Amino acid sequence: PFHWDSLILATGASCFVPPIPGADGANVVAVRTFGDVARVREIAKTAKNAAVIGGGVLGLEAASSLAEAGLSVTVLEHGDQLMKRQIDAQAAQHLESAMAGKGVKLLKNADSARIDASGVTLVDGRRIPAELVIVSAGVRANIRLAKDAGIAAERHITVDDHMRTNLPDVYAAGDCASMGVSYALWTEAADMGRIAGINAAGGDAAYQALPRPLIFHGFGTALFAFGDTGRQANIAYEIGEMPGARYYSAGGKLVGAVLTGDIRRMEEVTNLILQA
């Protein structure tokens, strides 16, 4: 047994694979590790068609790479817009146009009924040929160890701003932990780990959760979104538009922005929003 004075749980997260019949097939990959990438490359050597379940950043990056490798790619998006919680409709349309320009098909409101070795059958009966299927449906925190130990956890291990759990001298950090919102990003995990380490060693440091930007490169274009990009129905936004950029203001303050194509000003824009 190991003895400790302070303990940090950093159990991470695992890919969420929806309970679709056939999702455990040899041609289905949820990409999380280098081993998963190696599997994709091996299957892609003989595959002609690929389907990507999930239209988030990682799914679209995978779709872009597969298209570059010469595969015929179809993206299956559950919702009616790509990345609806993060980008506005105009940015989503920009992405759709870029995808079409690279020959990548997008099906929205597309729910998978089953997967087999030759493709995906949708709930509405449509058949998508795919010898390779990538599932990109988000992650789920690995919390079983914490729950078995009596640590408070629902979707994530619950921590305060010092990364403390409900048990004395037990901390948690990274994708497994949350103060209420989790972006499951490396930068966030690194910041949380630093705070947990300081406090576990007897220091006193508090974690400040910051909004995280969305950055995407693929299909010959790029996209950046940060802050509130017009998603609140009860807010009267003022929208400023320039070629490849939209700025959202509310109450006289800049609250969000979306850049498409040329995103070199993303750091400047981020600072302007944070300072507003």
Segments (PLM) and residue ranges:
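Redox-cofactor binding/interface segments in oxidoreductases and associated redox assembly factors
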Residues: 9-10, 52, 122, 135, ...
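Glycine-centered tight beta-turn/hairpin loop motif at sheet-sheet or coil-to-beta transitions
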Residues: 1, 123-125, 220, 242
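Glycine-rich dinucleotide-binding loop and its adjacent helix/turn
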Residues: 6-69
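Short hydrophobic core segments
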Residues: 2-14, 53, 73, 128-138, ...
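Rossmann-like dinucleotide-binding cores of NAD(P)H-dependent redox enzymes
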Residues: 49, 58-113, 207-223
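Mid-to-C-terminal Rossmann-like scaffold of FAD/NAD(P)H-dependent oxidoreductases
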Residues: 176-267
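FAD-binding beta-loop-beta segment adjacent to the flavin cofactor pocket
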Residues: 15, 157-171, 228-246
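FAD-site-proximal beta/loop scaffold in flavoenzymes
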Residues: 24-47, 118-121, 126-198
